[in-house]
Amino acid sequence: MSWIQIPWSWVVTLIVTYLSLPLIIYYLVPYIFYGNKSSKKRIIIYVLGDIGHSPRMCYHARSFSEKGWQVELCGYVEEQVPGFIAEDPNIIVHALPTLTLQGNKRSIIFLVKKVLFQVSAIIAQLWELRGSNYMLIQNPPSIPILPIAVFYRLSGCKLIIDWHNLAYSIMQLKFNGNFYHPVVLASYVIEYIFGKFATYNLTVTEAMKEYLVNSFGLNPKRCVVLYDRPATQFKPLTESESRTKLLDSEFIRDMIPEGFNVEKGDKIIVTSTSFTPDEDISILIGALKIYDNSYENLDKSLPKILCFVTGKGPMKERYVKDVEEHDWQHVYVKFVWLKSEDYPRLLQLCDYGVSLHKSSSGLDLPMKILDMYGSGIPVIAYNYPVLGELVKYNENGLKFLDRRELHESLIFAMKDPELYKKLKQGALKESQIRWNSSWQSAMQELKLVA
């Protein structure tokens, strides 16, 4: 009987493989695919922006935490994160490293360097967080997070995209409306192709849902509208709270001009802006200049206006200079950058909020209006078709298209107490609809929570 000759190297290989299988199955595979998997449901929430000034994503984090999920909140930490995030034991904040580059921020070379740096940082974070059940990203931006998130699905992680707007439309605005600019085209292609691979989709308006379903081919059964709603920190003043007393609070006291008196009818308005082309603050400044001139030349009964402009962004210094160079007589304009906990306190003290958001896509709604409604203040908003899903003219706000119309709205708003009373009631009614109930309803529709 002849024996089959088997090389000893094969025998050794088979024995080593056989002995290694338990190690591979029980240690290596879990290490690669599961990492530090939690016994709780675990979700990664990505913010390619400052976490402290990304309220909707922070609200998501808190809502998932309240359901007992482990939340890994990833993003830039430029300012202090909100207390309700920092103090929540179910939420861990993972700071993305920042890259400081000099040069033209619109150049292709600059953008490529920035994207490559972000890709390496995000991949490194996702490796550490492998084993998560879900990943929630906001869009925009789509580059580079959307393709990375889609490929991350190969680990078994389900992807949720929260469509705040369309990234390509914002890029198109930055590049002077040129849809065929390479960056704009790349953004459009990435959204169009990779957006289809999400397990679930959330949108901020019905109009955006319709667009994504009809133009991007998203599954309507896996796409749900989740309107922005104010969180609990945005609330109207109660009857027992004195507005005059609160105006003497440390965070605002030094910003109240001498001789300005709300008890004598002076008015406070506020706008929040990122100083970008889709929020033209020159409309507000121009309207306030006309208002100031109206007081001097036409109507001495007009109340003084104190206007707070909150936020920061690339075009801020230009507007600050414009305001400083004007000889104001009856209007005060203050540019402020507030802590996240002070912004709701400021809104409570205002008579009106002003929204300058134009919407690059025409499909989104500004979160700032919801914060204003949550604080019980009516809104004067730049008008575009989708705005009607939120702002009802002469019910909870007023609308305008240019500085002249905004000036007229300011005149009506400042002088007509009956109009203010009516709009105030509409805003207070809107303030009763809160984030938690809207979030719960949307997540139940997607069968993500019970």
Curated annotation (Swiss-Prot):
It is found in: Endoplasmic reticulum membrane. Pathway: Protein modification; protein glycosylation. It is an enzyme of class 2 (transferase). It catalyses: an N,N'-diacetylchitobiosyl-diphospho-di-trans,poly-cis-dolichol + GDP-alpha-D-mannose = a beta-D-Man-(1->4)-beta-D-GlcNAc-(1->4)-alpha-D-GlcNAc-diphospho-di-trans,poly-cis-dolichol + GDP + H(+). Residues 35-106, 128-450 are cytoplasmic. Keywords: Endoplasmic reticulum, Glycosyltransferase, Membrane, Signal-anchor, Transferase, Transmembrane, Transmembrane helix. This is Chitobiosyldiphosphodolichol beta-mannosyltransferase. It comes from Candida glabrata (strain ATCC 2001 / BCRC 20586 / JCM 3761 / NBRC 0622 / NRRL Y-65 / CBS 138). The gene is ALG1.
